[in-house]
Amino acid sequence: MSRAVHPGTDAALHGKKGEDLRPIWLRPEPGSRRPRFTRDQIAAVAVAVADAEGFEAVAMRRVATELGTSPMSLYHYIAGKEDLIALMDDALMAETVVPDDELPEDWRQAVVTIARRTRGVFLRHPWALAALHGHNAPPSTPISPNAWRHFEQQLAVLVTSPLDIGAQLDLLAIVNDFITGHALRAGEMEQRRNTDPALVQAALEFGRELLRSGRYPFIEALSRSPAGADAAILDEQHSEEQFERGLSLLIDGWCTTQHQDR
């Protein structure tokens, strides 16, 4: 979830120039009877641009061009780039919400189902974690409505678990961090696959040269095993299996720890 903003007074809701600093979802959409665009449409276009060309390509001018309008007219709908980023974040978080009829009744399986779906969103949009949730994200980006829906769903499936609220929150934090780390790693692997083959080959040869030095005996032993072969390292299916296995170990291990602590 994005970082929240908690203004302390009504005065904090307006900037020095009188601009409305409330989150975009608290500001009314354009009052025209037939606005040309909705905020959802603007967000969808911005996400599509990021998917095709990377987050760096997302700009008010570019989104306006894709919508067939002028940059100035876009400011009728949103105040600027930070609003655009907030809408993009909300659009992606909407994708993480699992339809109720697809949620298993068993709470563990429900947690896994939500985790799989969330990971899938980040894999489809590999730019999102760094751009919307990393250190480059605007510090004032509020927690979006769909991020609240995602968190609410995670808490709802844990109601039938034997965990108390503190343990539930800890489990969700661990699972969410695992999803984030695994998605970032998968994004790096995808980037590597799309790199110039000559550069990949040069990097592999450098690694083999280090192994031949004899200074890394444990890594050398790993490289001789099927799990350490170059093809396996870049295998997407292997990554999927690793995610499933790691997620199960996290949930089962956490529940075992809670039981032992009682």
Each model region followed by its residue ranges:
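N-terminal intrinsically disordered/low-complexity leader segments
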Residues: M1-R36, P217-I233
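Hydrophobic alpha-helical segments that form the core
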Residues: I165-D230, E241-L249
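Helix-turn-helix
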Residues: Q41, V45, V49, E53-D83, ...
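Amphipathic alpha-helical interaction segments
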Residues: Q41, R62, D83, T113, ...
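Amphipathic alpha-helical packing segments from all-alpha helical-bundle domains
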Residues: T113, N136-P162, G166-A173, A183-L184, ...
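Hydrophobic alpha-helical connector segments
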Residues: V98-S140, N146-R149, V175
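Short, basic, alpha-helical segments at the C-terminal edge of helix-turn-helix-like DNA-binding modules
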Residues: D89-E95
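A hydrophobic membrane-anchoring alpha-helix module
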Residues: D235-D261
